[in-house]
């Protein structure tokens, strides 16, 4: 087994909630597919599994650290696509040793698509991410299995000449495992929930804040650190934004 890495995060108690940070809410799915499959230990900040919003304020962090009544979210796994996705990803990772301990190999990278493999003891798990609004096709190097199955959609694909040809829906991700080697998984809805309100403007925290300062705050919301370990995988605009959001320094 490989060395254990430090944990990865997309938000925490000091920064804006991921659902607020994402300009395209549909990217909630590919961001979290990456969080649960890239090398490292995934960390979810409480409440973000429900897709709650939280904007960084100048004078207070109260909006980042709300008191939640868990009774209000009792049926979130059934009714909230964000929660259903996080629960499914946790189950997949728990049952897939390669995602915990496997080596990493990049398979494909464009400005909107990204694919990589996690290999462990002869088992290859393939992860595909599509940040585009349209369906994407990928032709990827497979492992020794004759067939692969998606843990998120239950779709099956055959291995031909050592490769698999898969299609990935827009603004989504997939985790492909050798068919028969892993438990059966219930398909999940990949679309992020529609927020009741969206933070599209920045209100001044005091009367002295100018419109220019507010605009600067909006620009700052879209700036995130990029992990050195994934610099090669984050060298194009759309995927760079997603990977940078996924891995915290």
Where are these regions (language model features)?
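Solvent-exposed beta-hairpin/edge-strand motifs
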Residues: 141-154
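Intrinsically disordered, low-complexity repeat and linker tracts
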Residues: 188-249
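Short, solvent-exposed loop/turn segments at secondary-structure junctions
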Residues: 14-16, 50-52, 73, 114, ...
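Carbohydrate-binding surface patches
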Residues: 107-142
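C-terminal beta-strand-rich structural cap/linker in extracellular carbohydrate-active enzymes
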Residues: 160-195
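Aromatic- and carboxylate-lined catalytic core of secreted/periplasmic carbohydrate-active enzymes
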Residues: 64-107
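Alpha-amylase-like alpha-glycosidases and glucanotransferases acting on alpha-linked glucans and related
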Residues: 1-38, 50, 57, 99, ...
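Short helix/strand-capping turn motifs
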Residues: 41, 60-61
């Amino acid at each position: 087994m490989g060395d254990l890495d430090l944990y990865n995060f997309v938000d925490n108690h000091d920064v804006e909630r991921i659902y607020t940070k994402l300009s395209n809410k549909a990217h909630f799915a590919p961001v979290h597919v990456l969080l649960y499959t890239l090398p490292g230990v995934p960390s979810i900040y409480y409440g973000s599994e429900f897709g709650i919003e939280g904007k960084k304020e100048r004078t207070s962090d109260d909006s980042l650290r709300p008191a939640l009544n868990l009774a209000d979210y009792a049926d979130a796994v059934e009714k909230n696509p964000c929660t259903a996705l996080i629960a499914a990803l946790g189950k997949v990772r728990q049952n897939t040793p390669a995602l915990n301990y496997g080596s990493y190999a990049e398979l494909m990278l464009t400005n909107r698509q990204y694919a990589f493999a996690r290999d462990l003891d002869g088992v290859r798990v393939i992860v595909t991410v599509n940040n585009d609004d349209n369906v994407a096709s990928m032709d990827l190097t497979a492992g020794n299995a004759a067939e692969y199955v998606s843990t998120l959609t239950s779709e099956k694909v055959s291995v031909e000449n050592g490769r698999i040809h898969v299609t990935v829906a827009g603004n989504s991700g997939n985790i492909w495992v050798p068919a028969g080697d892993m438990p059966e998984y219930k398909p999940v809805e990949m679309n992020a929930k529609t927020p009741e309100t969206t933070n599209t403007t920045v209100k001044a925290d005091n009367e002295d804040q100018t419109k220019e300062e507010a605009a600067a705050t909006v620009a700052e919301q879209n700036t995130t650190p990029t992990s050195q370990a994934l610099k090669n995988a984050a060298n194009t605009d759309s995927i760079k934004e997603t990977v940078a959001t996924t891995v915290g320094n």
